Amino acid sequence: MGCGISSFKRDSSSNSNGTSNNGKDVLKGKTNKGSFNNNNSGNTNTNNNAATTNNNNNNNNNNNDTSTINNLNTSQSKINNSSGSSSNNNKTGVGEQPQQTPQNINSSQERKNSVNQPNNNNNNNNNNNNNSNNNSSNNIANNTGSSNPTVSHTKSLSQSMNNSNNNSNNNNNTPASIKPNSSPVLTTQVETQQNPLTNSGNGLNKSQSQPHPTSQPSSSSLTKQQQPQQQQPQQCINSPQPTQENNNNNNNNNNNNNNNNNTSKLTDSGKKPDFNNSNNSNSNINVNSVNPSQNNNNNNNNNNNNNNNNNNNVVHNNNNNNNNNNNNNNNNNNNNNNNNNNNNNNSNNISASITNNVGSSNSNTLNNLNNSTLASNDINNPFPGCTAILKNGVWYTESELLEENYVWTPKYWTPDRIGKWVDDIEFSENLTNPSNSNSPNQQAQQQAQQQAQQQQQQAQQTQQQQTQQQTTQQQTQQAQQQQQVQQQSSSPFANNTTNLSTTPNPSTSVTNKNDNPIESI
């Protein structure tokens, strides 16, 4: 780029050239020469890139951080390239400067043009501010439909911060005073001075901060721009002082740090878009256009707002946790109620068993009732027609209790005959000697013993009878045998036969030793 001052005219018809092909023609240096609106087209191209990155933000949060760093690098490259000239032209948005013949700096007309040059720069800065404001609002509108509004909004804020950096550099690059006799400063020297910005600790990439080879002017353009400097070096105006450039570097570093804080906010909160940050970004742009030294204060305010948003998110998360805990407590209460219901059921069962026990006790032992008297017409009265009185577990009539020397005749409840009171059959009523009267238990034992004795006697009798029958049978058998022997001895064949044995031989039925065919009797 040349550093000579020349008068320029505004060309409103060159806006279409800057926006074609997303700034590709601008990067190649094919725009109209001498138009200041190329700066606006460069900003438009940057905003188009921001819109593209916003669309990518909907898909990947990690790409948001990288895209933010890329935008910062492009903004740094703009700073490095735009500081070499007195105009607002940069390599990304403006092509070659027009070649004009050098004029006499001592002429009044040229001095007027050179004095009016900063005013033109201020107007261009205002235009850039308007573009940046519109772009930031467009980014907010586009980001409302995204799945993660906060991520996209932070991206638009970083884009607006990049625009504000460009504006502040434009203000600082305006010459404060005209020095006709100053030495020329080449663009290559300015680039070497501002290259350390790329190596600052802002996470910027050195390769990304350097301008693209296509955006650099050709060798022919460099020679064309350097010819006026070689012929008339005294007519060139000096570039901004190094102290001003260092101040710009400091401001840019602060802005970059704030952008990094915004990217850290992406990881902390992702709930709702914060429209207060968009307003703060617009206010930062306006302030940067007026006084670049106020960047630090405004950026600190942005950081405070971001911190407040983070705190709100944390509180909101705590509220969610409290709600969950309350739900758990409610569930526990329900469980406790269920346990109480179970306990009630158990108590009901216990009471039912108690009532059953009471019923059984009433059915089995009515003598243990606490009622001391029963009316004469009571169903449970053992003495119908008389008042019954309970004493020591035994029911008595009133007359029995009133008589002094009366032997009590208790009435016993018989379970085999339910509902009736009967006297004990075996109970002896002896008025004079009550000790002679036996208890029914003793009588029962005596009866059992007597019955056992009788059974034994009967058994003995039966045994005796059996033995007698056996003896009689034996006697009859012996008598029959004697009769048979007598009959045999009186037969006519007695001389020819031998004595017969009383027991026959099982092998042969013949008992005669002489083998006579005589069958045994």
UniProtKB/Swiss-Prot annotation:
Residues 1-356, 429-451, 467-521 are annotated as: Disordered. The keyword Lipoprotein applies. It comes from Dictyostelium discoideum (Social amoeba). Residues 97-108, 149-161, 174-206 have a biased composition (Polar residues). Residues 13-23, 37-90, 114-148, 162-173, 207-262, 276-356, 433-451, 467-488, 495-514 have a biased composition (Low complexity). A lipid is attached at G2 (N-myristoyl glycine). This is Putative uncharacterized protein DDB_G0285119. Disulfide bonds: none annotated. It comes from the Eukaryota. Keywords: Lipoprotein, Myristate.
